[in-house]
């Protein structure tokens, strides 16, 4: 059995009180916008998962363009809830990463280099080149991704398993 530590704290300001409500859910920063951002490297399954999530959640799937993503975000906000695929190159800007975090939930689809290479290439030679390129991308972008994410889901499994896992995480 777990033993809880109980301490008596003397408050210097006895007129101040805190009210903890159990009848109302705690506010969550992403609820007003209803935006779920999917981030990950090429081949992690962002497009496929975005389409599946959009279908399951009853909202559109969008992809941010590399040119003028801020304007695209404004249109997305105006349209309401959406699942938004974010190209990894957009994560270079710190202000943009902060904007993602403050306007929705950011979910990282974390796939192995091997799985991403298999999805992107059709021949063994292409897979080797893809593995090398993806390894370099992971080294460069994963620190930025880790600074940005709020949720993370493994993405090596088949699409239906990844989608089920992501849905469970999103609905928490």
Task: Give a label for each model feature.
Residues 1-34:
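Extreme N-terminal, non-catalytic leader segments
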Residues 41, 46-82:
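Conserved substrate/cofactor phosphate-moiety recognition/catalytic segment
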Residues 126-165:
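Small-molecule kinase domains that catalyze NTP-dependent phosphoryl transfer to phosphate-bearing small molecules
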Residues 38:
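Hydrophobic anchor at the beta1->P-loop junction of P-loop NTPases
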Residues 100-123:
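Conserved phosphate-donor/acceptor-positioning beta-strand/loop module used by diverse small-molecule
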Residues 88-91, 112-114, 158:
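Short glycine-rich anion-binding loops that position phosphate/pyrophosphate groups of nucleotides
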Residues 47, 113-121, 131, 163, ...:
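An amphipathic alpha-helix signature
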Residues 83-87:
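Structural recognition of the conserved hydrophobic beta-strand(s) that form the central parallel beta-sheet
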């Amino acid at each position: 059995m777990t033993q809880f530590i109980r301490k008596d704290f003397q408050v210097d300001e006895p007129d101040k009180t805190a009210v903890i409500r159990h009848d109302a859910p705690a506010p969550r920063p992403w609820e007003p916008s209803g935006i779920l951002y999917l981030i990950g490297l090429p081949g992690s399954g962002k497009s496929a998962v975005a389409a599946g999530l959009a279908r399951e959640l009853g909202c559109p799937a969008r992809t941010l363009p590399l040119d003028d993503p801020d304007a695209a975000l404004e249109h997305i906000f105006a349209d309401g809830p959406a699942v938004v695929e974010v190209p990894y190159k957009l994560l270079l800007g710190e202000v943009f990463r902060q904007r993602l975090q403050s306007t929705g939930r950011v979910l990282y689809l974390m796939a192995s280099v091997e799985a991403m290479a298999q999805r992107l290439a059709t021949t063994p030679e292409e897979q080797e080149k893809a593995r090398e390129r993806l390894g370099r991308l992971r080294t460069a972008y994963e620190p930025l991704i880790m600074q940005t994410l709020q949720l993370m889901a493994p993405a090596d499994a088949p699409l239906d398993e990844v989608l089920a896992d992501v849905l469970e995480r999103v609905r928490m």
